[in-house]
From Swiss-Prot:
Transmembrane segments: none annotated. The keyword DNA-binding applies. The keyword RNA-binding does not apply. GO terms for cellular component: cytosol. SUPFAM superfamilies: Double-stranded DNA-binding domain. DNA-binding protein which can interact with a randomly chosen 20-mer of double-stranded DNA. It holds the Pfam family dsDNA_bind. Keywords: DNA-binding. InterPro entries: DNA_bind_arc, PDCD5-like, PDCD5-like_sf. HAMAP family: dsDNA_bind. This is DNA-binding protein MTH_1615.
Length: 111
């Protein structure tokens, strides 16, 4: 084998090892994401009534980022011990109104 072939072979092995390592890291990240998602789902089942969960699921179809924000707030409240009983659909509606009310409205008036 010539020096050039040896260099090519080493470089190819290096690239294959890098690709394997990246694939393993991506798989580990995906598993971590799935595990966190399952934990979040379990917490939401503990703190929300079925109707409230259904409302969030429907809202997730149109505004996934907004629902993510609400879920994180609910989880934080639960972890701080501020959720005494399951949150009902009516309570969730009020929370959604308060959070959505913070959004700025931009009005354009034409002359």
């Amino acid at each position: 084998m010539t020096d050039l072939e040896e260099i090519r072979r080493k470089k190819m092995l290096e690239l294959q090892q890098k690709a394997q390592q990246q694939a393993m890291e991506a798989e580990a990240q995906e598993q971590m994401r799935q595990q966190l998602e399952m934990q979040k789902k379990q917490i939401m089942m503990q703190i929300l009534t079925p109707e409230a969960r259904s409302r969030l699921a429907n809202l997730r179809l149109t505004r996934p980022d907004f629902v993510e924000q609400i879920e994180l707030q609910l989880i934080q409240l639960a972890q701080m011990g501020r959720v005494r009983s399951k949150i009902t659909d009516e309570q969730l509606k009020e929370l959604l109104k308060r959070v959505a009310g913070k959004k700025r409205e931009i009005k354009i008036s034409r002359k």
